[in-house]
Each structure stands twice: as C-alpha cells, then as structure tokens.
UniProtKB/Swiss-Prot annotation:
It comes from Bordetella parapertussis (strain 12822 / ATCC BAA-587 / NCTC 13253). The gene is glgB. Pathway: Glycan biosynthesis; glycogen biosynthesis. One of its GO terms (molecular function) is hydrolase activity, hydrolyzing O-glycosyl compounds. The keyword Transferase applies. This is 1,4-alpha-glucan branching enzyme GlgB. The lineage of its organism: Bacteria, Pseudomonadati, Pseudomonadota, Betaproteobacteria, Burkholderiales.
C-alpha cells in the first residue's frame, strides 16, 4: 500500500485550485492532464478522495503526483514527451483499492469537427452518432465517449458509477461554437449508469439524464445507461425488401394497437421476450397486417402510457433491454407483421432530470409559457423554430426506423402542434409572424420530418393523429402538404361511435352520422381508428358503448366492425376489441382473456379474423382506398329503416355491403346491384359461427332484372336485424 504523498504548492494559482475542487471550473483541459512547462511535462490530476496518484510510463517508470490540496495532484513526469496523449497511465489509490486507467485529460478532442458544424447548422444526420454515450477507441484505448448539447451551460461534467457520482472528477470540454460538451472516459463500458451534472446559465447545478441515451433505467430510477453496441443479428431481410409494397395506399393494412405493459401478464417474464413469443403469432392468426405499439420510448410515469416520454432514443427499460425490443420487432417481421410506433414530438414532461431548462435556459422549450407550456397536459412544448431541436426530433424518428427496423411512426397530437391557439383562450396565445394562429415552425418541422423519413427510410410510413380539417396532411410536401402517408380519420370515428351509442329507435334521425364520412373520405389517405383513446377516461369499452342487453351489444359490435371493414380506409383496432372486452381498459391490468371461454366472445374474435381475411384477399376492399372510383352508394338515404348499402369495386370485382342498424328484420328488402348474375354471401355477421342466431339469407343469391336504386338489376332478401352482409358478384 502506498503512503499519502507530501503536499506541494504546485503551479496553479489558488483561485484555479479552488474552482477545480468546488466543481466550478469550466475548462478542465486547460489545467488538467499533461501540460508543457519549459522543457518538461507536468501532469495534473483531479481525484477527490484519492490517497495517492502515480503516472506510469509504458516502460514501467513511476512518478508520484504530489497533492497541491487534498484531491488535486501534480508533478513533472520525466521521460514524458509532450503531445503523446496515451504515453502514460494513472495508478490511483482509493480507500477501497487501486485503479489503473488512462487519463481522460490526456486526449485531444474526440468529436469530428465537420460533423459538429453540420449539427450546429441544424443537420440531424450525425446527431445520434455524435451526442450521447458511444463506445470508442482513442489512441488504442477503449472506453466511452460522452457528449451533450448544452450551449448556455457554464460547466458540464459526466457522473456515474465509474466516479462515485462526483461531479468534480470528470468535467467536460466545450466544443465552441457548436455548444457541445465532450469527454472520452477510458475503461468505461456497457452497463455503466451515468448522468450529466450541469452548471446552468442561471447558476444552478442540476443532474440531467442524457437526452440521447439509447438505454435508461426503469422508473423511478432516472439514470442513463451506456448501451451495449454489439449489432443485433437481424433475420428480416425478406420483410424489409417487401415492406414498401405492403404499406402502399393500395395494400390491405389492418393494425392491431397494443399497450405492451397490459396485453398479457406472463408471471413476471421480461416483457419484450414474452410478447415476442406470443403477440406476433396471435396477431397473425387474426389476420392483422401490423402491430402498433403505444409509445415504447423511456418515460418516467407509467400512467402516461408513454405519451410523456423523456428518452426519445431508448426503449422503456420496464419491458427489457434494447436488444429484447429488437428481437420483438424481428419476430413480428418473421410473422409477416409490420411494426408501427406511436411517437411523441408534440410535448415533453418537465421532470427535473429531463429536458426542461437543460442548460439553465429554455433550451428545448419556448421561454414564454404561452408558447412553451401545454394547457391540457401541463407539459412543455418543443421550440420547433430552433434548428437544433428539429434536428433532435428528426434524429429520434430516424433512429427508431433504422436502428430498430420499425416500419412506421404514428405521430401523436399533430393538431396541438399545428395551431398556436390549441386549447388556449383569447389572450393566452402568441400569433405567428403574420398574425395568424398557424404554427409555421411546426409545419416546417413536420414537412422536414416526412421528407427525411422518405429519403432515409424507404418503405417506412408516417401516420398523423390529426383531429381537425387541416388541408393536405397526406399531400406531398412538394405540393404544399405535410407529407404524411396516412391520417387517422377522427371525424369518422366520432360520428359513427356517436351513432352506435344511440338507442336504435332514434338512429333514423341521425343517419348522416354513418354516411357523412364519405363526403371527405378521399380528401386524405385515411386510417379508421378504434384506438385506446375510445376505451379510457370513463368512455367504457367498445362493447359497452352498444345499447341493449349483452346479445344485442355483441350483435351491434359485429355489425359495426363489418361496416368499418367494408368502408374505405385502413383499419385500426385496439387490443381487447377483437373479442369484446367488457371493462374499460386499465393499463395496470391485463386484458380480460377469460372472456374467450364464452362462445359469443370467441365468435366476435372469429369475425374479426374473417373480416381481416376477406379484406386482405378481396382486392376491391383495399386497392382503391384512395380512389373515389372504388366506392359507390347503393342505399344511402334509407334513414327510416336505418339501412345502408354500398359497393366496393376494382377493375374486375364488386362487393356489396348491406347493413341493418336496427333490431327489426327487413323482410323482402330489395336493393340494386351493379351486375347481373349470382352474388355469394362472403360475410354474415349474424351467422352462428360468430355467435349470432343464424337464419340469414342463402349462401348464393341471383339478381333479378328489376330496376332499383339506379341499377337495372337488383337483389331481394330478408335482412335480419343488427346484421351486416357482404355479397360478392360471381364471375
């Protein structure tokens, strides 16, 4: 054991020594590490709590560094050549043992200057590879490179398991003018927990998680984790090659929306591993084409369901390691399923360890709460006018799509981004530079985002949750649109659910709620969403929205699903809806799988599977989703009987959907059809295989030359109550 070294006065003035030991010195590389002093090289080391420090040359020569003050060591090192950064190592004696390491302050700048300049100009291309924690080898020394954008900070240090969370030990170098602080720490590897200690422009010292961390602790812990950067062994080459064709507007897209934490409880098994073993095969067996996950990004509060994330580059640790999430995506692709993630660039929570006032200023958010705080969620709003913030968000999106092979992003709360007065009364919002309510900076950001995804991630899609009539959400950026591939049809969802909640005796007065959606069905490329938002906050379940006794509720839900699957637009159904979950969704409990012991609920699940199969295999139900020629009303005005009939067509096929939204049978109901000949029943929601009473029409019907509804041919049948029929023309 080495003895404590005698103290010396040293070559640093008292003020500098005090600033170092107090954790206030902003430029550690100017005083720590090797420095030329005349013909000699002086080495200084800041190691509070160390008993002794020695500089060890490659040949084994040892030079004790002498303490100027407890924790601050210095000495001339004979034989050390200036400008040879890796030419010595440190041997540090701590109370608990000996540490051998290279000196972090012996290395020059580690970030590429050209890439830094690109990021400083608002470029996102190199951002995820520059900032955060990355494995690196510098001058033959392995370790981790840390970097943080904090341009207004007075000082930044990286703290963690490797330095006892002592902010004095590893202060970082500022790369001006990019505003990025960097430090290479030798011998720090995957699994190490860390944060950044930031002395802000406001004079306050705070601990911040890494905004670009690719791995994080599970809440309530808040540290970032140095990730394991070994590449994942993907097996989805075939899927990735076919992805673009599977996600086009003329392809069948049926999305199963899932909250990873409550789909199934597998007795404490790691969530992604458990889901990978069960969920892809389940969704595939029901005919879904995609799984959409509520946000999987690291978030501090589970009750937010992920919609208040702080780790925009890290999968939530509660479900497993990043590699486990990659495995889940790979298994989905193996099962022929795409993966869409909900992604939240609209706002972020103000937790102390997060982005809020990261460098002592409103860096990621607006300074004025009329712009920077969201009145609905009490969260902070990104400053889209700042190029570095736009780059941060776009880099996050590209990271999920490229690093994790994700197939699409559903962008949350787009309406709140587009309007400066969203949820704000008069006098509580700031107009744009033209005096209007449009958020011009957010518009530019969304266009830039979608353009970047299109170039960098061919075949990937973006979907907007946009609840207003903003024009051109899915129009190309070049044509003045926002550039999304699809938009949730919130209007269709609200209108039709409002209709279905009504007592059937009153539905005749609200027939337009079912038909109005076709007025604007081709204004955008739409997804019809029955999402998690419709089964929370006292809204009850989808089944619970249907009036009447349980048998009537199930019959109406079957009818509603058949109407939806025949209607133009891609499909989305939240988990539990496929078998008629009775209770409102609870994120703290798994789905009511026991309901599948009931034949009626199994029948509903079977119907969803059959609807998906028919939708995917009959081209007229999907290939002209974005083309008005693919739809024609047959019976759109029979409000008295609450009956709708319409045709879905392509160049060679025709399917007619007939829906009776009352419990009253309609015997001898006649409606026109576009073609003469035989029409086969492809779906009958009242069939016994779906839990219905049966008694529907025969499997094949022949048209009669009796004009009806503008067609020279017609069909006549007994239309049961609460029933939808799909009739396909036989060639």
């Amino acid at each position: 054991m080495m003895r404590d070294s005698p103290s010396i006065q040293g070559t640093l003035d008292a003020a500098t020594q005090h600033a170092l030991l107090a954790g206030r010195h902003a430029d550690p590389f100017s005083v720590l590490g090797p420095h030329q002093a005349g013909a000699h090289t002086v080495v200084r080391v800041l190691a509070p709590g160390a008993r002794t420090v020695m500089a060890v040359l490659p040949g084994g020569q040892r030079t004790p560094l002498l303490p100027m003050q407890p924790g601050l060591f210095e000495n001339t090192v004979p034989g050390l050549q200036p400008g040879a950064p890796a030419a010595y190592r440190l041997c540090i004696e701590w109370e608990g043992g000996i540490q051998h390491t290279a000196d972090p302050y012996a290395f020059g700048p580690v970030l590429d200057t050209a890439q830094l300049d690109h990021c400083a100009a608002g470029g996102w291309r190199y951002l995820a590879g520059l900032l955060g924690a990355h494995a690196a080898s510098v001058d033959g020394c392995a370790g981790t490179r840390f970097a943080l954008w904090a341009p207004n900070a007075r000082r930044v240090a990286v703290v963690g398991d490797f330095n006892g969370w002592d902010g004095r030990r590893h202060a970082m170098r500022l790369r001006y003018p990019a505003g990025v602080w960097e430090l290479f720490l030798p011998d720090v590897g995957p699994g190490a927990r860390y944060k950044f200690q930031v002395l802000g422009a406001d004079g306050h010292t705070v601990l911040k998680a890494d905004p670009l961390a690719r791995q994080a602790e599970a809440p309530p812990a808040t540290a970032s984790i140095v990730p394991d950067e070994r590449p994942f062994a993907w097996t989805d080459e075939a899927w990735m090659e076919q992805r673009a064709a599977r996600q086009r507007c003329d392809a069948p897209i049926s999305i199963y929306e899932v909250h990873a934490g409550s789909w199934f409880d597998d007795a404490g098994a790691p969530r992604w591993q458990s889901l990978a073993a069960r969920l892809p095969e389940y969704a595939r067996s029901l005919g879904f084409t995609h799984i959409e996950l509520l946000p999987v990004m690291a978030h501090p509060f589970g009750g937010s369901w992920g919609y208040q994330p702080l780790g925009l580059f890290a999968p939530a640790a509660a479900h497993g390691a990043p590699a486990d999430f990659a495995h889940f995506v790979d298994r989905c692709h193996e099962a022929g399923l795409g993966v869409i993630l909900d992604w939240v660039p609209a706002h972020f929570p103000d937790d102390a360890h997060g982005l809020a006032r990261l460098d002592g200023t409103p860096l990621y958010e607006h300074a004025d709460p009329h712009e920077g705080r969201h009145p609905d969620w009490n969260t902070l709003i990104y400053n889209y006018g700042r190029r570095e913030v736009r780059a941060f968000l776009i880099a996050s999106a590209i990271h999920w799509l490229r690093h994790y092979h994700v197939d699409g992003l559903r962008v949350d709360a787009v309406a709140s981004m587009l309007y400066r007065d969203y949820s704000r009364p008069a006098g509580q919002w700031i107009p744009n530079r033209h005096g209007g309510r449009e958020n011009l900076e957010a518009i530019d950001f969304l266009r830039e985002l979608n353009a970047a995804v299109g170039v960098q991630c061919p075949g990937a899609i973006t979907v907007a949750e946009e609840s207003t009539a903003w024009p051109g959400v899915t129009a190309p950026v070049a044509n003045g649109g926002l550039g999304f591939d699809y938009k949730w049809n919130m209007g269709w969802m609200h209108d039709t659910l409002r209709y279905m909640r009504r007592d059937p005796i009153h539905r005749r007065h609200h027939h337009h709620d079912l038909s109005f959606g076709m007025v604007y069905a081709y204004a955008e490329r739409f997804v019809l969403p029955l999402s998690h938002d419709e089964v929370v906050h006292g809204k009850g379940s989808l089944l619970g929205k249907m009036p009447g006794e349980r048998a009537a509720q199930l019959a109406q839900l079957r009818l509603y699903y058949a109407f939806m699957w025949a209607h133009p637009g891609k499909k989305l159904l939240f988990m539990g809806g496929e078998f008629g979950q009775q209770g409102e969704w609870n994120h703290d409990a798994m789905l009511q799988w026991s309901l599948l012991d009931d034949p009626a609920h199994r029948g509903l699940q079977r119907l969803v599977a059959d609807l998906n199969h028919v939708y995917a295999t009959l081209p007229e139900l999907h290939c002209r989703d974005a083309d008005p020629s693919g739809f024609a009303w047959i019976v759109g005005d029979d409000a008295d009987n609450s009956v709708l009939a319409f045709a879905r067509v392509d160049a060679s096929h025709c399917l007619v959907a007939v829906c009776n939204f009352t419990p009253v049978p309609r015997p001898g109901y006649r409606f026109g059809v576009p073609h003469a000949g035989d029409w086969r029943v492809r779906v009958d929601t009242g069939a016994t295989r779906y839990g219905g009473a049966g008694g529907g029409p025969p499997i094949c019907l022949r048209s009669e030359p009796i004009p009806a509804h503008g067609h020279p041919q017609s069909l006549v049948l007994d239309l049961p109550g609460f029933t939808a029929l799909y009739l396909r023309h036989s060639e």
